[in-house]
């Protein structure tokens, strides 16, 4: 619970500047990659975005779908509600979701998976709330030989700006989260024992980020 509270507190405190931060570290490509992730769940009539933050993914999703986002940060959800008034937002834990079994056609996570405290428990919950053959799409940072360069970029090249925007401790939190990234193979090894079949892996920005599409089996 302490880890989750720290995560919620950090994201609550940066909610006003979070979109600026994401544009900064992704060289303004964040929306392109989120749209690529959303293509993997195209046709979903019910969509759940886990760790929805400021609601950017749901804002870009099919407006005809029932769009729901959950997050641990109330401050983030307040921003999201202003952005996407036709979406539903719930203050909830991804490892204990307040939804009935087989509620959603698809689940998305944008730069969230590596922050989860108990990923096995989340995947069990995702299995439960997804309909049979439902889709899970994960966009996140890849752990491979270029990742240290991204850490260096954040630790030194843009650190002064990061500290101005978020403060030293919170900036260190984001750097540490990058160091905890999973490789695509590590992610695959977590998904498959928990009832998901990996369908597709796409890489962007020389492999620094990936979009992994999986199906509930």
Predicted features along the sequence, with ranges:
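Conserved class I S-adenosyl-L-methionine
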Residues: 1-42, 56-57, 79, 170-175
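C-terminal alpha-helical "lid/dimerization" subdomain adjacent to the S-adenosyl-L-methionine
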Residues: 5, 22, 57, 139-190
């Amino acid at each position: 619970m302490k880890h989750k509270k720290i995560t919620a507190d950090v994201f609550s405190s940066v909610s006003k500047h979070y979109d600026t931060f994401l544009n900064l570290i992704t060289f303004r490509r964040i929306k392109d990659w989120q749209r690529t992730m959303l293509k993997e769940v195209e046709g979903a009539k019910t969509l759940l975005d886990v760790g929805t933050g400021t609601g950017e993914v749901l804002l870009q999703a099919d407006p005809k779908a029932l769009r729901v986002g959950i997050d641990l940060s109330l401050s983030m959800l307040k921003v999201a509600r202003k952005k996407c008034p036709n979406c539903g937002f719930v203050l909830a834990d991804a490892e204990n979701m307040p939804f009935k079994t087989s509620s959603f056609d698809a689940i998305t996570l944008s730069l969230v998976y590596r922050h989860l405290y108990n990923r096995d428990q989340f995947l069990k919950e995702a299995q439960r709330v997804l309909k049979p053959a439902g889709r899970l799409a994960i966009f996140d940072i890849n752990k491979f030989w270029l990742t240290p360069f991204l850490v260096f970029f954040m630790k030194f090249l843009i650190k002064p700006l990061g500290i101005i925007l978020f403060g030293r401790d919170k900036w260190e939190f984001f750097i540490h989260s990058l160091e905890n990234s999973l490789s695509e193979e590590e992610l695959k090894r977590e998904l498959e024992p928990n009832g998901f079949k990996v369908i597709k892996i796409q890489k962007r920005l020389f492999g620094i980020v990936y979009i992994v599409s999986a199906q509930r089996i």
